[in-house]
Amino acid sequence: MALLKGVKPQYAIFTADREFADYEIDAYARSHNCPIAKRVKSTNDSFAIMKDGTKYKWVKPTDSSRGYKCSTGIIDLATCSLEFIREWIPYICLYAEPEKNYVFVDSSNTKDSKPYDLHTLIDRLQKIEAILGNVEKLGFSDMEYGWQRLTYLSVNAKEKEITFDTDC
């Protein structure tokens, strides 16, 4: 179901980490070059209304969040459980279209964090699949070659290493 013409979008930031929600609100304000008109920050709430009328709200991934409705979901893959994503987000993001209105972020992925291990990667991919279904285009962006599609997987059991290859 799409938003009615003229209705401003409402973004829900699904994360257990309020500081990360605050960071995401500030990042979206900067990236969209839209100043914040009203801001509420407290222990249990983080909310912003931009000058253009767009709203951003921190939504804790708990059963009590199910009454909130939004048009776009920003989902923290590190703190939202697979069950919450599968059972509640499609009903909370009532006006969202899976191909356009979901943003996946990972609050555990910082410059100081360790690289993903296999269990973490599987966890993140299962959560994405719960919303998008099967994603057929898997790859990465390379500064030299641009978009590179993953085409082959090799496993070195002795070194406990998995390698993804491309056509290049």
Model regions: which residues?
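Phosphate/NTP-binding elements of NTP-utilizing enzymes
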Residues: M1-V135, R149
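Detector for the mature cores of small, proteolytically processed
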Residues: L125-C168
